Amino acid sequence: MANSLLTPTAVTREALRILHQKLNFIGNVDRQYDSQFAVEGAKIGSQLKVRLPNEYTVRTGKTIAVQDTTETSETITMATQKGVDVEFSSADLSLSIDDFGTRILEPMMCVLAANIESDALSMYNDVYNQVNNVGSSATFNTILQGRKKLVDNLAGSTGLKCNLDTQTNVDMVDVLKGLFNNPTNISKQYLDGMLGQTGGFNFFENTLMPRHTTGSDDGTGDYLTNDATAQTGSTLTIDTGAGTLLKGDIFTIAGVNRVHPETKVDTGQLQQFVVTTSTGASATSLSISPSIVATGARQNVTNGAANNSALTKVGGASVDHDVSLGYAKDAFAFVTADLRMPRGVDFAAREVMDGISMRIVSDYDISNDEFPTRIDVLYGYKTLRAQLATRFANN
C-alpha cells in the first residue's frame, strides 16, 4: 500500500498529544483556552480575565445587614511565546504518523514541554503556605502536614496533587515501603520508584522542580514593623534589618494569626507570608502576599501588624533547599490562545487539546526539497488562589 503524506492537522494533533502527556504540573492545574483569538490570532500581551469566587459575611440576629457583592478577578497576560524550529524532508512526510512522532516530534516536544513547565513552576514563589523541613529528608508526616494546610484553607480533601522533586520522591518511597499499601501502589513503589496515590495526594515526580535559596537574613526576628497604626495591605513598613529577604522567602509576623476562611475564628496559628519582591538590608518597606486583611468578607488574619512586631523568616540564612508543591487544581491557571495563521505558506495548522493551543507552520525550500518548520505555543500563567497550594521545603 502506498504511503500517504502527513497532513498539517495530523502532525499538529500528534505534537499536541505528545506535549500534553509530558506536562505533569500544567496537566493538573486549571487550563483555560481563550477562543476569542481564534479568527484574528493572539499576540504577546493579549490578556484574559479570570473571575474569582465571591466571599460574604454572615449576619447574627433578625435585623437585615445587606452587603454588596464585590466581584474580583485576576488578569492573565499571554506574555510568553516559545517554540521549536526544525527542518524535515519530503521523505520524512511520507512516514507513518507513529514513525514521524517517534523520530521527529518526540524529541521536539520533550524540550518544548520542559521549558514551558519550568516557566510555570516558577509560580511556587507566589505560595505562602510552607511545611518547613529544611535540612532534613521528607517523611510521611511532612506530607500530612502539607495536606492539613490545604484542608484548613478549604482546598477539599480529594483531588489534591503533589509534584515532588526527585530526591523527595526517593525519600518518600523509602519511607513508605514498609507501610501498608494496596497492591497497585506497592507495584509502583518497588518496580517504578513511584508513589502513586497516598496520604491524600496523587503524586508526580518532576525533574524540573525548582530549588529555592533564602535571603541572608538569619530568621531571628531582627526585622521589625515600623508604624504606629496596625498595618494591613500588601506592603509593610519596616525597620532596617541585618540581612536580605529574597522573593519567595517565607516569614511570619508576631501576633498576626490566621483565621478560619469562613467563620473568621482565630486558629491560634501564625499566618505565613511570602516576600514578593527581593529587598536589601537597608530596605524600609516590604512587599508581601497574602495582603493583610483584618476585617470583612476577605479577612484572613486576626489583626493588622502592630508596631515593632518581629518578622521571622523561615529556613535560615542563605539556605538552598528543594521545593515540592502540593495543590488543588484551582490554585494555578495556565492559559493559551490561538496564534495568527499565516497565509501563503505550504503547510500550516492550529489545534487545541485540553486547553492547550499549538500552531505549526512550514514553508518549502524548493532548492533543497526541505520544509523549514516552526512549532509555537503562546501562553500565560498565574497563581489565582495561593491559599490552595503549599510548598514542601526539604533537604
Predicted regions and their residues:
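Glycine- and charge-enriched low-complexity intrinsically disordered segments
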Residues: T277-A337
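A generic local secondary-structure boundary/capping motif
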Residues: F37-V39, R147-L154, Y190-M194, A242, ...
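Beta-strand elements of well-folded, non-transmembrane domains
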Residues: N54, S90, M209, A294, ...
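Autoprocessing Asn-cyclization modules and mimics
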Residues: D171-S291, R391-F392
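Long, contiguous amphipathic alpha-helices that act as assembly "spine/axial" helices in icosahedral shell
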Residues: V50, I76-T142, V151-T168, L191-E205, ...
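Exposed beta-sheet edge/beta-hairpin loop segments within beta-rich domains
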Residues: I97-D99, T237-G241, I360-S367
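Hydrophobic, glycine-enriched assembly/anchoring segments
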Residues: M358-N395
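N-terminal "assembly arms/tails" that initiate or stabilize quaternary assembly
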Residues: M1-E74, A389
